[in-house]
């Protein structure tokens, strides 16, 4: 190859690379209907393909619906140590989760599944150190990806957080005849074990006035299976709208390992690819 041809080849490669970077910066400039750029650019670790289904999406993770869907191989998502902010957590006990996504004409359902050898169901402990899982979405997906540390002032995120202690079956078993346990749970009855929140960085987690996410978790055979469900679109300006494919992140806390707040395992951004 001559010097002239080599220089031309390098110039073309640089031009393509610049165009790719521009694509990433403007997000939808090169893909008006999705966020596929994050996979191509390496900003997303992997993609989860959501399956289109007919009929209702059950909230019970033990429903045969999910067992049949499980015939479609779930995506394995690795969870990383949280080493960005204090208290850092170099060794989270949950290293990975399986995720399945389904969508009908009006709703999105996501099933998380991970191994957990112990169910922490002592209410006195679980009030602060309970098994938990959360999904995080950028509120404005047309902008650059938010910081993985729960967004920032200009990059607000919508978070769905499930807590085992809010599961009615677990709460009732945990209380028993212990008066102090009853006192702890009094006035803390939740309509759903999943809370709809927003955040603009660490220590800014805020409960929304409107709670639009439902869910349920079941612990069987040393495994948690948790369903999150919400309408694809709504009128709440604090909620993410699922009009197109979008990025998301996953976090898991193991109460038995004394994990809470920033002490968790967290994924990188992944693409939730809608049908």
PLM segments and residue spans:
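Acidic/polar low-complexity flexible segments
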Residues: 31-71, 125-186, 234-275
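Short amphipathic, basic-aromatic surface patches that mediate peripheral association
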Residues: 116-123, 236
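Short helix-loop boundary/capping segments
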Residues: 170-218
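Sec-dependent signal peptide recognition
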Residues: 14-21
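Exposed beta-sheet edge/beta-hairpin loop segments within beta-rich domains
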Residues: 215-222, 238-242
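Short, well-ordered beta-strand segments enriched in hydrophobic/aromatic residues
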Residues: 61, 107-114, 224-230
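C-terminal motif of bacterial Sec signal peptides marking the signal peptidase cleavage site
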Residues: 27-29
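N-terminal secretory signal peptides that target proteins for export/translocation
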Residues: 1-12
